[in-house]
């Protein structure tokens, strides 16, 4: 059982009220928890300007999820987000673990030699 760290960025429609945004965030947070994700943390960044229009909107509500899990949660939550009209875009990333300083220094010395 290999546990990895993941980051999931979601952009919600800007015309959702605070209550609806809270419902969507809670829905996906519970979804992750119920599907064996650990240490789920959520940061709502709020309404931000988009780089380009998505569905004729210039703004979007950004939500960032960080969690640890085996990976089976990703396919399930992405499927649900594709079917949800309130989600305009999403991106999930597997985070690489930080290497200890000793390994970094040893690698740097090996490259120099």
UniProtKB/Swiss-Prot annotation:
Gene3D superfamilies: 3.30.70.60. The keyword Transferase does not apply. One of its GO terms (cellular component) is cytoplasm. CDD domains: bS6_chloro_cyano (cd15487). Pfam families: Ribosomal_S6. The keyword Oxidoreductase does not apply. Keywords: Ribonucleoprotein, Ribosomal protein, RNA-binding, rRNA-binding. This is Small ribosomal subunit protein bS6. The gene is rpsF.
